[in-house]
Amino acid sequence: VGVSAFSDSPAQAAELPVIADYQGVDFTALMALEPDLVLAWGGGNKPQDIARLKSLGLEVYISQPQTLDDIGTELLEVAALTGQTDIGQTLVTGYRHELEQIKQQYQQLAPVKVFYYMWSQPLMTIGQGAWANKILASCGAESVFIDSPIDYPEVSVKQVLLRQPALLI
């Protein structure tokens, strides 16, 4: 019934009201929609917002995938919560099959060094612990900031150029 800012998939998401962004949840807008289930991102939603959602009596599913396989597991859990188990199983089977094909295609190649452009003001990318590195690794790429101890570091254009990425994402 509602989405977070910049939700663009599926295309119908653009037609739904925005009830959250990087600053947090718009509780007035959310409650007006009377949701049956709220999907939250453990790494992206503020803990106090998640606690408030629960205190309001809403059913909250907290997504916290750590691996690419976790995405399939969580999709099955959400499918069960929404009564769409068969559709969920079909989607996850397809997802896991395609993921395995991609991994096999790139596993023997040397990783391509990439700059993953995450945000512009300030310029941010992904470091060692960012989940996006798992996606990059599965298709034969690696962040030029993989050595950063910060998961989502702020960087300068000069730092990016010094690392000489072969590709900008």
What are these regions (language model features)?
Residues 27-34, 56, 155-164:
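Short helices/loops that flank or line small-molecule/ion binding pockets
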Residues 4, 129-152:
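His/Asp/Glu-enriched short active-site or ligand-binding loop at hydrolase and phosphoryl-transfer sites
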Residues 37, 47-124, 142-150, 163, ...:
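Extracytoplasmic substrate-binding proteins
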Residues 1-33, 37-44, 49, 144:
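A short, structured surface patch at a secondary-structure boundary
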Residues 15-17, 52-55, 76-77, 129-132:
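Short, glycine/charged-enriched secondary-structure capping and boundary segments
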